[in-house]
């Protein structure tokens, strides 16, 4: 991790440490977890939240913030964001946010302990880097993600052998 990227993650980490911010995020986690519980076939559910909830200055490239809840025991499969650099923090529970590409995954086990080192709680995923969350079977995993595009522009791309391009794309808010 470069010193510049560490500085960005530290700024985001600081923004998430206040009690009022954590309470707001917990309320979003509750809603998103309820959505996931209603959708028995879904592996994850999500909701963006306004950046102005964070009472501190964010790195200027941050354009959206999200809460994702990933189902216990799930492997959501490979995905990447062709238009955004993602920075993600484990908020509740734990999981392995693997990066790389199919057949050559690199493990990044993340925990939600606020006293754990930054590298054990955060991962930085550059634009177009394949990643896949693998969630522990004992509990759902709630994460906070920051992206470099506005919420309505965030694209998820997944492998799809049935398409000429070999992938399919969708916007998270278009689902």
Please provide the spans of the model-predicted regions.
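Short, hydrophobic/aromatic-rich beta-strand segments within well-structured domains
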Residues: 68, 88-89, 144-145
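Conserved short histidine dyad/triad with adjacent acidic residue
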Residues: 64-86, 125-127
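A short, N-terminal "cap"/entry segment at the start of jelly-roll beta-barrel domains
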Residues: 1-62, 114-115, 175
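Short histidine-centered beta-strand/loop micro-motifs
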Residues: 54-59, 76-82, 88-89, 134-136
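Glycine- and acidic-residue-biased ligand/ion/polar-headgroup-sensing regions
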Residues: 72, 82-103
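Double-stranded beta-helix
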Residues: 101-118, 130-175
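Short, compositionally biased strand/turn segments
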Residues: 42-48, 52, 93-110
